[in-house]
Regions:
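Preference for intrinsically disordered or flexible, low-complexity segments
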Residues: 3-289
């Protein structure tokens, strides 16, 4: 047997091992693909995707930032110390087509303009430094000038920098379908149950990097699944099971929205309370990298 024959034999011996490794890789990839597709199908729910526009919204339009509707006989929302909150966003509910959400009136999100954007680390459902308000039939005789006269001119330039919204923007709505994000607290249990059920022998290996194959839930939206820069503050015991509103950091030619170091803001509500248009119990959170 010559030297060439020895090399040929070694190549033949090596090929089956390489093929076997390749087949294992392909098999694992196929399993991940199958699991991903099944989970996407099982978790798909409708949502409204939102985009900022450069239009000038009126007092009654959907908007991010700017001046929000306030009834004739009402004050701008304040915290327990008498400090006014600022309008984070206003939604014209006639633009929402999702089931169980209100389809008329105005839904507003107000937060305190401080260094934590109104976040309460001890109780993120206490509507003191943030407020969620719903006006089923807003009074169309209210004017923007009238509301502006109620605003306290007490914000310094330093305080102004804390507010996540830079300016005022309109909102464009589009119907979409959202699938579970790896940020959602239900993601791991959902994945684990399916993998252990269908692929018990490969479960641990498959679960290790499964979140790499799913979306993080970012973007502006109503309904759907949330995104977080760090983690979901909810747990399986939490009753705030619906994403009421999410506002992400957004950079155009310049930063339009910035939560801390490029974070995301979220508002959650219980499904039954949403159906009853009861916005007294809402969980507000935001986080950043």
């Amino acid at each position: 047997m010559g030297l060439l024959d020895i090399f040929k034999r070694k190549d033949k011996d090596r090929v089956p091992k390489e093929v076997e490794a390749s087949e294992k890789t392909d098999s694992a990839a196929n399993m991940v693909k199958e699991i991903r597709e099944e989970i996407l199908q099982k978790t798909a729910i409708p949502c409204m995707k939102l985009e900022l526009t450069d239009t000038k919204p009126s007092l009654f339009d959907s908007k991010v930032g700017g001046i929000g509707y306030v009834p004739h006989d009402a004050k701008i929302p304040e915290d327990s110390k008498g400090v006014q909150l600022r309008l984070l966003a206003q939604i014209d509910c006639a633009e929402i087509t999702l089931e169980d959400f209100p389809h008329q009136g105005l839904l507003q999100f107000w937060i305190l303009n401080d260094d934590v954007s109104g976040l309460n680390f001890d109780d993120n459902t206490l509507q003191d430094t943030f407020r969620v308000l719903y006006f089923k039939e807003p009074d169309r005789t209210v004017t923007e000038k009238e509301v502006c006269e109620k605003v306290q001119d007490s914000s310094s330039d330093e305080e102004e920098d804390y507010f996540p919204v830079r300016g005022c923007y309109g909102l464009a709505f589009s119907e979409d379908v959202d699938t579970i994000s790896y940020s959602d607290y239900r993601f791991e249990s959902c994945i684990r149950k399916l993998v252990q059920q269908d692929y018990p022998e490969e479960a641990e290996n498959l679960l290790e990097n499964m979140d790499d194959f799913f979306d993080g839930g970012s973007g502006h939206k109503i309904g759907g699944y949330p995104g977080f820069a760090q983690w979901d503050p909810r747990s399986s015991e939490d009753t705030h099971d619906v994403l009421l509103f999410q506002l992400d950091s957004d950079m155009g030619t310049d930063w339009k929205i910035l939560w801390g170091d490029c974070g995301i803001g979220n508002f959650f509500i219980n499904w039954e309370k949403l159906k009853n248009c009861d916005f007294s119990d809402v969980l507000y959170t935001w986080d950043c990298c």
